[in-house]
Amino acid sequence: MLFRSPGDKQHTLASIVKVVSACDAASCDLVAKVYELVVTAGVHKASSIKVAEAAKIIENTQRDLNIALMNELSIIFDKMNINTYEVLEAAGTKWNFLRFQPGLVGGHCIGVDPYYLTHKANKLGYDAQVILAGRAINDGMAGYVAKKILQYIIQNNGNVKDAKVLVMGATFKENVSDIRNSKVADVVKELKSYSLNVHITDPHAESEALKHEYGFELTPVLSNDYDAVIITVPHSDYKKLDDAYFASITKPHALIADLKGMYRGAISSRNYWSL
């Protein structure tokens, strides 16, 4: 099983233990020997192909569920006027707290693999309620974010059709060009359904690929009068941006919606919100 996260330079082919299996012991030994030539972390022989495949599926399902919990907590804490990241920092002082963060869940693994398991469970007569509940929460985050932006604009501007929103980030995760199953596309779609004028920028994505896959293109020249800016993907390129930059591209009453909390404590001239 050869799986690694796109853009991850720390967990490389050689440094990740490989789970292997085959139709018989001799074939499994052969596959293991091939991997052992390049994988310094070691090889784990699973007892069957089913076990190996199930291991990969639950790895991504577990991550999906943990992020879903963070997303649900973020929604609850927002209603309570509590900063989610402050709560996570406090909880993170405990050795047994798992460090996950809220955010959009896209890509071709985490948001997809759980459905293989729930589909198989359904065929066997079992309804995987927890897994599907997590999927529903994560898939609903794009709509949740778009609605928060709409509500803010209505309260502070009123004229939705004249409002402009900048979405920063279009790929499914940071520092990659991969746009497969990007939930940013869902955010853009939801925003446009409210008749908002949406501009999109991304230092890694290709405009033609976005147009082909989702029907929208990157904005070549940014405006200086956005009513809201949504930082959807925490690309490293964005880390150098500061309060002055966001002030230069937005109206005085604008909202900076920082989904991954990149600019916590750094935005003072505009209204700030994060998951």
Regions found by a protein language model. Name each.
Residues 1-275:
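Structural/interface elements that position substrates and couple domains in central-metabolism enzymes
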